[in-house]
Amino acid sequence: MASFDGPKFKMTDGSYVQTKTIDVGSSTDISPYLSLIREDSILNGNRAVIFDVYWDVGFPETETKTKTSGWSLSSVKLSTRNLCLFLRLPKPFHDNLKDLYRFFASKFVTFVGVQIEEDLDLLRENHGLVIRNAINVGKLAAEARGTLVLEFLGTRELAHRVLWSDLGQLDSIEAKWEKAGPEEQLEAAAIEGWLIVNVWDQLSDE
């Protein structure tokens, strides 16, 4: 049975985020973990899945290729209130990643991200991956609060402006980022996902 058996991190409100990191191989079945993410988003998160994508950047081999054609998806982070799933993706993609494509195509959850427009374009152009129900939470915050600058803030700054929450835990990791180990980097990823869950909840209630 699939379980999030990675490190568990305590958030500032006393709750915990359970993590799972998967190096996706040709025989890796990620669908049970995606199902757990979807289930937690429905039960505990206003049907929202917080997503972040990470890229490997190369250079076009010929002049006919665009500047973005050398970008390839290297990993994906999916977060809910209680869970954080980090997928390291193979090159080239395997057939089992169709589960990820289907997950992103779901109409039953909202995929929430920060400054996501370029990522959405790259996913579609370079991988044929379409996120059907995606929301830029910074843009939503800017409209809700009447403050344009919120649309252009990163995760930390946006969470600070919307929630005014204690970011000391995240700041301490980022201050030593170059020396931080994999577990500390995973903790930072879990905190960022959890913060945006709370930003989404706050804006949804306004």
From Swiss-Prot:
The subcellular location is: Cytoplasm
Enzyme class at the top of the EC tree: hydrolase
Q: Does the keyword Nucleotide-binding apply?
A: no
Q: Which reaction does it catalyse?
A: Exonucleolytic cleavage in the 3'- to 5'-direction to yield nucleoside 5'-phosphates
Q: Which InterPro entries match?
A: 3-5_Exonuclease_domain (IPR051132), RNaseH-like_sf (IPR012337), RNaseH_sf (IPR036397)
Q: What is this protein called?
A: Protein RISC-INTERACTING CLEARING 3'-5' EXORIBONUCLEASE 2
Give the GO molecular function terms.
Answer: exoribonuclease II activity; nucleic acid binding; RISC complex binding; single-stranded DNA 3'-5' DNA exonuclease activity
Tell me the Gene Ontology biological-process terms attached to this UniProt entry. Answer: positive regulation of miRNA metabolic process; regulatory ncRNA-mediated gene silencing
Source taxon at top rank: Eukaryota
A GO cellular component annotation in the UniProt record:
plant-type vacuole
User: Which segments carry the region annotation Oligomerization?
Assistant: 35-71, 107-132, 171-178
